[in-house]
């Protein structure tokens, strides 16, 4: 009962904080918040510089694949556990998901820098 109460309180508090953070900024929307600020001086150039969307997508793809590789780092220690068959099955599924994601990105030309 104590564990269920703790879990319920944590989930309720998290949902309350997320909803407050979502709706609070919408109450005070005015144009001054959207303007750039450079220590009280007039901006030297435009603060809304365009950037390459391809660069952004490749960076996000790298972060996702890097996170999946980081999940495999404790694999040598996990193999020595009592259920190594389960460990190898889960790691094989993780590597398969990584390979399928890479194949999907490759087929959709997500890794092509020039078009």
UniProtKB/Swiss-Prot annotation:
It catalyses: a ubiquinone + NADH + 5 H(+)(in) = a ubiquinol + NAD(+) + 4 H(+)(out). The chain crosses the membrane at residues 4-24, 55-75, 84-104. Its EC number is 7.1.1.2. Its main location: mitochondrion. The keyword Glycoprotein does not apply. Core subunit of respiratory chain NADH dehydrogenase (Complex I) which is composed of 45 different subunits. Interacts with TMEM186. Interacts with TMEM242. This is NADH-ubiquinone oxidoreductase chain 3. The gene is MT-ND3.
């Amino acid at each position: 009962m104590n564990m269920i109460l703790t879990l319920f309180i944590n989930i309720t508090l998290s949902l309350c904080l997320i909803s407050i953070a979502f709706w609070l900024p919408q109450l005070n929307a005015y144009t001054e918040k959207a303007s750039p600020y450079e220590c009280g001086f007039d901006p030297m150039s435009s603060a809304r510089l365009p950037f390459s969307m391809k660069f952004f997508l490749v960076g996000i793809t790298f972060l996702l694949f890097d996170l999946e590789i980081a999940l495999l780092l404790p694999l040598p220690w996990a193999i020595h556990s009592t259920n190594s068959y389960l460990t190898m099955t889960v790691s094989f599924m993780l590597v398969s998901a990584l390979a399928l994601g890479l194949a999907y990105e490759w087929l959709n030309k997500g890794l092509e820098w020039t078009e």
